[in-house]
UniProtKB/Swiss-Prot annotation:
This is Pre-mRNA-processing factor 39. It holds the Pfam family HAT_PRP39_N. It comes from Mus musculus (Mouse). Involved in pre-mRNA splicing. It is found in: Nucleus.
Length: 665
């Protein structure tokens, strides 16, 4: 999209407080049961999507049963074309944009509901589209449904100041004006809004809207109470709020700004000061109760003194808050895109800024401020798993359910195809003793993104750690069976053979796995190396025949000449060090000389330009192995250092990436 979601409604009409006699009054349940308090993150297990539940089911569970007037067969003519595009590729954001634009233009309610509901399963952070959806319901006079859409949106993105403002304007338009219940509902909504989003650095317009509304109602004491809160929160317009607060104090009488208790306490404080100066008698003898009129003789002086003291108290709050703002200002200026977008961040700098800001807040801020900053971060960087992982890691020291909630949102909504987040979620559940939940997370992800070796191996290790050896073996056998290439099949065969030999202590079965793999992938050096390593682990005297058979398979097989010579040299060394028959040693030596002559012949042909050297046709890793082994020979290492040879081939982890493309984002 060319325009950001945050900008879509920047110039839109925020609504008015106009009357609407045709709209029925809507009864609003208690917000506390419906709007997530992002400062706590103490979610119950039922509040977070289950690891094995469908994401769509989780999202749709929040929707009300909406009455419709159109049958599905009456969908607009082009709907199916747009729908198939996003159904085939839910990550095609442009396809979603075209679909939603189309259903809006057609003004087809049922088609719009289907499109918007499915869209928000994948992109719940697009605040502008929640507004579009709610407006669509409202245009069809579905006030209750519009209200529900707003509530679902605020559950999905409770830090959206703009969405809160749109919702409050919606309530002003649709609730009965002048009704006490209406005021209670709106004030309650304001309270939930500032609890959820009021500590956001850019939440000023929400606070200002709250203050203006209380002023309109004539609730000066409530205005003061709101100022008491905002003047202690680091926000972008902190200085503006303090200036408006001073105007609020100067333009109204102190007794109208303060509660009765605050008013009495302030008068006593000032009277006490005057008493010490000798101006008045003991403050307790002649102080009024605080509710009768102030003496005309003292009226002007006392009012000004009280105003001065009120501002003085709040000046201290302002000074401290200004210091807190200054510590965060540079970080806030570095946030160029505070809203969600599918496009990557333009440069590395925004990511670095987020990381440094989070580290600063973790070190210096309260838990509430840290959580709010993380929530802001994962809106802007929702498609970057590193920030979700950092968030979950932070929550480990505060709330087990908080960790689970973070992982659940990341994996089921925003990062359905990112392996690391899923693997860490599964590991977390395993740590908590939820073994079956860990299984489900890994299995579900593997079904979503096929062919990831790292996930299959994590499933195997999970079963092994908990004593399910048969299941671990079955998972590896299944991976061999469904491998897309011989190379992949050989990789899993090596893993299975090592599992059978090291864990289950079943040498014959392990040997069979590797021999079968060699028959299918005769040029894979790793198979021979692992077979040799396994045979060497047994009694050398009793297992001499199997070791020699392994050498012969490599020497007489399809490996490049250089690797065959290497195996031949190792065979000679083995017979020299451990062999029981000198005839076998002499035969091995003669065979080795024959291979060297064959290599010389090939080199001469290559030098004459008649044939490409065979070793250049080999895999890079096989050539590297041969070069290392040749280096050992040149160093005159008499001992058969098989351990070093084996380790060389596993210096670098297996390249899982060759079996799957990077998951789409």
């Amino acid at each position: 999209m060319q325009n950001s979601h945050m900008e879509e409604y920047r110039n839109s009409d925020n609504g008015s407080t106009g009357n609407s006699s045709e709209v029925a009054v809507v009864e609003h349940p208690d917000f506390s049961t419906e709007i997530m308090n992002v400062t706590e993150m103490e979610q119950s297990p039922d509040a977070s999507p289950s690891a094995h539940a469908s994401t769509e089911e989780n999202e749709m569970a929040n929707a009300v049963n909406l009455p419709v007037t159109e049958a599905e067969g009456d969908f607009p003519p082009e709907f199916e074309k747009f729908w198939k595009t996003v159904e085939m590729n839910p990550q095609d954001f442009t396809g979603w944009v075209y679909l939603l634009q189309y259903v809006e233009q057609e003004n087809h309610l049922m088609a719009a509901r289907k499109a918007f509901d499915k869209f928000f399963v994948h992109y719940p952070y697009c605040y502008g589209y929640w507004k579009k959806y709610a407006d669509l319901e409202k245009r069809h006079d579905n006030i209750k449904q519009s209200d529900e859409v707003y509530r679902r949106g605020l559950q999905a993105i409770p830090l959206s100041v703009d969405l809160w403002i749109h919702y409050i304007n919606f309530l002003k338009e649709t609730l009965e004006p002048g009704d006490q219940e209406t005021n209670t509902t709106i004030r309650g909504t304001f309270e939930h809004a500032v609890l959820a989003a009021g500590t956001d650095f850019r939440s000023d317009k929400l606070w200002e809207m709250y203050i203006n509304w209380e002023n309109e109602q004539g609730n000066l004491r409530e205005v003061t109470a709101v100022y008491d809160r905002i003047l202690g929160i680091p926000t972008q317009l902190y200085s503006h709020h303090f200036q408006r607060f001073k105007e609020h104090v100067q333009n109204n009488l102190p007794r109208d700004l303060l509660t009765g208790e605050q008013f009495i306490q302030l008068r006593r404080e000032l009277a006490s000061v005057n008493g010490h100066s000798g101006d008045d008698g003991p403050p307790g003898d002649d102080l009024p109760s605080g509710i009768e009129d102030i003496s005309p003789a003292k009226l002007i002086t006392e009012i000004e003194n009280m105003r001065h003291r009120i501002i003085e108290i709040h000046q201290e709050m302002f000074n401290y808050n200004e210091h807190e703002v200054s510590k965060r200002w540079t970080f806030e200026e570095g946030i160029k895109r505070p809203y969600f977008h599918v496009k990557p961040l333009e440069k590395a700098q925004p990511k670095k800024n987020w990381k440094e800001y989070l580290e600063f807040e973790i070190e210096n801020g309260t838990h509430e401020r840290v959580v709010v900053l993380f929530e802001r971060c994962v809106i802007s960087c929702a498609l970057y798993e590193e920030f979700w992982i950092k968030y979950a890691k932070y929550m480990e020291n505060h709330s087990i359910e908080g960790v689970r909630h973070v992982f659940s949102r990341a994996c089921t909504v925003h990062l359905p195809k990112k392996p690391m987040a899923h693997m860490l979620w599964a590991a977390f559940e395993e740590q908590q003793g939820n073994i079956n939940e860990a299984r489900i997370i890994l299995r579900t992800f593997e079904e979503c993104v096929l062919g990831l070796a790292m996930v299959r191996l994590r499933r195997v290790s999970l079963e092994r750690r908990h004593g399910n050896m048969e299941e671990a073996e079955h998972l590896l056998q299944d991976a061999i069976k469904n491998a897309k290439s011989n190379n992949e099949s050989s990789f899993y065969a090596i893993k299975l053979a090592r599992h059978l030999f090291k864990i289950q202590k079943n040498l014959p079965k392990s040997r069979k796995v590797l021999l079968e793999a060699i028959e299918k992938d005769k040029e894979n050096t790793k198979l021979y190396l692992n077979l040799l390593e396994m045979e060497y682990s047994c009694d050398l005297k009793q297992n001499e025949e199997n070791i020699l058979n392994c050498f012969d398979k490599a020497i007489h097989g399809s490996l490049p000449i250089k690797m065959r010579i290497t195996f031949s040299q190792r065979k000679v060394e083995f017979l020299e060090d451990f062999g029981s028959d000198v005839n076998k040693l002499l035969n091995a030596y003669d065979e080795h000389q024959t291979l060297l002559k064959e290599q010389d012949t090939l080199k001469r042909k290559a030098e004459n330009g008649s044939e490409e050297p065979e070793e250049k046709k080999a895999h890079t890793e096989d050539l590297s192995s041969a070069q290392i082994i040749d280096g050992d020979l040149q160093a005159n290492q008499a001992a058969y250092n098989y351990s070093a040879w084996y380790q060389y081939n596993y210096q670098n982890p297996w390249n899982y990436g060759q079996y799957y493309p990077p998951p789409p984002t």
